[in-house]
């Protein structure tokens, strides 16, 4: 095949590796019952009001959706004290991340980010011929001092995932305020708050809308995939200045949020009961995993997301594989070059107990050859 057929940027791009699908594990290992604790999904399932909204709307799928998702934007605006002009909706948070890069990055522009964070930041920047400037975590957190030191005339964006995926911890109000004050106004700060609804119960979690109010060159990213439980229909959104939203709208697909997704997202916004139950269960599941780690002297990162990052003291790959054989799917840390760590999504109490039991059997009873 002709070597110059494809764009040069593709040579450095790596496809995103999602968590293993349940069906694939069932087929590979011949297991019927699988507990998927790999992709940070809602163990309670979708919001019932989202399901009802989809069922009402399904008879209209012959009609194109509202290209502007105006009703959804207006409902989000009410809850954030913004206007619909401050909001961009997308086909999941991933599309918003792509839109950000497409809006801001020129060839040679730099974007600062952590080495252990959501991988699509780097991919989206590379795709636009930008230059990712990648710094290691410091004390398991974004190295904010290092970020500031790396700012130069080519810096266009700084990405902050808060809580950070896959680690799960947060930057505090004090840390965020001190950082934002040192970033020049012409640098765009992207605050990825995919796990916002879990984190906001922590009084130390910063209010990103205050950041946006003080500096317009801020983009806040949120999603309906997590507490809303509608990851399968794909809806995310950005809160930003009217000017930035206007520019982002120029590069988005016309009908980028389908009619069922818009209905589902509106249902989630109304379903406070489902959200409250989800958050409550989340911290109960985290508590069970914390207790196990403490009783077994396993290091873990205090999480304000719907997953835990823990050091199992041995390489994660054989543990990951053995857990799959026993019907549990998690994310092995070697994917992020954290060889001895695993990321485990929160689940129902039964799922969490099953995971703990299987992990304990592997680590303490030699079920796998962990080396």
Swiss-Prot record:
In the record, biological process GO terms are: L-histidine biosynthetic process
Q: Which residues form a coiled coil?
A: none
GO MF terms listed in the record are: histidinol-phosphate transaminase activity; pyridoxal phosphate binding
A Pfam cross-reference name: Aminotran_1_2
> According to the UniProt entry, what is the EC number of this protein?
2.6.1.9
Post-translational modification N6-(pyridoxal phosphate)lysine, affected residues: 226
- Enumerate the transmembrane spans: none
From the UniProt record, give the pathway where this protein acts.
Amino-acid biosynthesis; L-histidine biosynthesis; L-histidine from 5-phospho-alpha-D-ribose 1-diphosphate: step 7/9
Tell me which PANTHER family the record gives: HISTIDINOL-PHOSPHATE AMINOTRANSFERASE (PTHR43643:SF3), HISTIDINOL-PHOSPHATE AMINOTRANSFERASE 2 (PTHR43643)
Q: What is this protein called?
A: Histidinol-phosphate aminotransferase
- Origin organism is Alkaliphilus oremlandii (strain OhILAs) (Clostridium oremlandii (strain OhILAs))
> What taxonomic lineage is listed for the species of origin?
Bacteria, Bacillati, Bacillota, Clostridia, Peptostreptococcales
Encoding gene per record: hisC
